[in-house]
Amino acid sequence: MTTHHRVRSSSNSSSNNINNNNNNNNNNNIHQLSSSRTMIDHHNSDPTSSSSPTNESQIHHFSNSNYNYNYDDVDDSTINSNSTNNNNKNRNIQNNNNQNISNNRDNNNNNINSNLNNQTNLINYNDDEDYDEDYEREIEDDEEYEEIGDEESSSGIGGDSEFNDSLNGSKAGSRNREIWINPNIELMLKIALSTTKNPYYYHNIAKKLEEMVGRPISEKLVRSQMTNLLGKNSKFFKHPYREIKSKPGIPKSLINSHNLREKQIWESCKNLITEIKSSPNYYSIGGGSFPTNNNNHNNASGASSSTSTPSTSSASSPASSSSSLSSLSNNNNNNNNNNNNNNNSNSINNSNNAHSIYPNGSNSGNSKNSSSSSSSSSSNNGNCSSNYPSPPLSENHLSLSLPSISKSHSNNTGSFGFSLSSPTTSSSNNSSNNNNNNNNSNQFFSSISDQQPSKKLHVVSPPLQSLQSIQPPISQLNNNNNNHHNNHHQNHHHQNHNHQHHSKKRKIRSYDSKHLEKFQVIREKVIETLSEIDDIINSMKNDSDNDNSEFEDC
C-alpha cells in the first residue's frame, strides 16, 4: 500500500503543480504536462522536473511496448482513475495553451499587417522633408527611388517578376546607382501640372494619384518626391535612368524595350518638370508657405499674359511659359501700378506732374496692356478708374474708390476738387480756379486726397491775384512737396503690398491722420506766406506808382 500512496500523492502533487503553473506561465504547462504523465513511470523519480520530453515524444514513450512497468502492488482502478483525471486536466490545459497560442498568433498577425499597411502608406523614400542634399549619403540607402503606388516591383516597370528580380539584384550591388524612372512619377507630375495652386496642393495631388493607382498615397510622400524632382539641386537630371546591359536569362528584346521605355518616361518627366516650373501654378516647392489668395491673383495675371493654366499634360510653348513667369515676378515687384507703361503720365513720378500717383485719366488710353501689370487702367472724360484682381477688392485699400480728378486740356486748367464717392463735389471748388492756368499750383492739394479716404478736404483757395502774381515760387514749392509726398506714398504702398502677399488677410495699416494735419498746417502757412508776399508786392506797386507820379510832377 505504500506504493499506492506514493502514486496517489505524486499524481496529486503533479496536478497541483500543473494548476499553479497554468495560472502563472502558460509556456511551462507543456513541460509540466510531460512530467505529470511520467510520474507513474519509475524512470522519472523527480515530480518537479522541468527537463522532461515533449508531448509528442512522451506519447511515443507510452506507446512503446518494450518498456516494462512494475504495478503489481498498485490498484488498477486507482491507476485508471488517476490517468483519466490527468488526461482530462491535460486536455483542458492543452486546449487553453492552444487557444492562447492562436490568440497570440492572431495578435502578431494583426500587428504585422498594421505595420505593413503603415509602411505602404508612408513609402520610405526621402520622407524627411529636411533630407540631406549630399548624393553620396543617398547612395548608401537601400532604395534610391522608391515606388509610388506600385507594389509589384521596385524597378518601376512592373511585369515579369524574374526580370524585376534580376534588375533588383543588379541595382543592389551598384554604388553609382542612378534613378529608376517610375511610371507613377510621370503620372504624379501630370497631376501636379493640372492641379491648381492652393494650400492643399500636395493633398490634392496625393488624392488624385491615389485614385489613379488604386492604393493609399501619403501627402508627405508626394511632397518629398516633388521636392526632389523640382528642387534647386535636383538629382533627377544628373542621374536620370540606367540602361540595362545584356544579362543571362533575360531576352535582349525585353532589355531593349525596358531601356526604351525608361528613356521615354524620363524624357516625358523632364518635359513635365520644365513645364511645371514655367507654369503659373508653379511655386517654390521647398518653401512650404502658401499665400491665401494667391490662386485668384495669379489667375488674373495669367489672363493678362495670354498663358492659361494647363488642365492636361500637354506642354505650352516656351514663350508663353516665360511670359507667365515674368508676369508672376513682375506682379510682385510693380505693386499693381502701371510703372512699365510707355506714357510717363501713369508712373509715380512723372514728368507732367500728374495730380495723383494713380494713373492719370487723360493719358491712360495710351498705356499698353503689359503682362507685367495686373491692374489695367481705363478712363473716359478725365475720370480715373483701375481694375484690380478680385481678392484684394474686398480687403485692402485698393477697393476704395479713387479720387475723381477732372482736367481740361483746352485751356490747360487744373481743377482740384476731390471726392471719394462721387465726382460731383469737384464742381464746387472748380469755380474759384477756372482762371488758373498753372497745373502745378494745384498738385500740392490734390496729392493729399489719396491718403485719407474717410475725410474730405475743403480747400480755401488764396486770393486769385496773389496766386497769379507769384507763380514761379509756388510751382517750385509744390513740385518739391509733391515729389516728396509721392516718394513717401510709393514706399508706403510698396511695403503694404509686400506685406499683403505674405499675410493671410489683406489688411493695410490706416494712414496716420498726423500726416494730413501736417499738410494742413503747411498749407495754412503757405497761404499765410502768400498773403504776406501779396501785401509786399502790392505795397511795392503802390510805391512804384507814387514814384512815377512824383517823376511826372517833376
From Swiss-Prot:
- Comp. bias (Acidic residues): 139-153
User: Which residue stretches does the UniProt record annotate as biased composition, category Polar residues?
Assistant: 164-173
Single GO cellular component term: core mediator complex
- At the top level of its lineage, which domain of life is listed? Eukaryota
Query: Per the record, where are the segments of Basic residues compositional bias?
Result: 485-508
* Ranges for region Disordered: 1-127, 139-173, 293-395, 416-509
Q: Where is the composition biased (Low complexity)?
A: 9-30, 46-55, 63-125, 293-387, 416-449, 461-484
Protein name, as recorded: Uncharacterized protein DDB_G0281497
Organism equals Dictyostelium discoideum
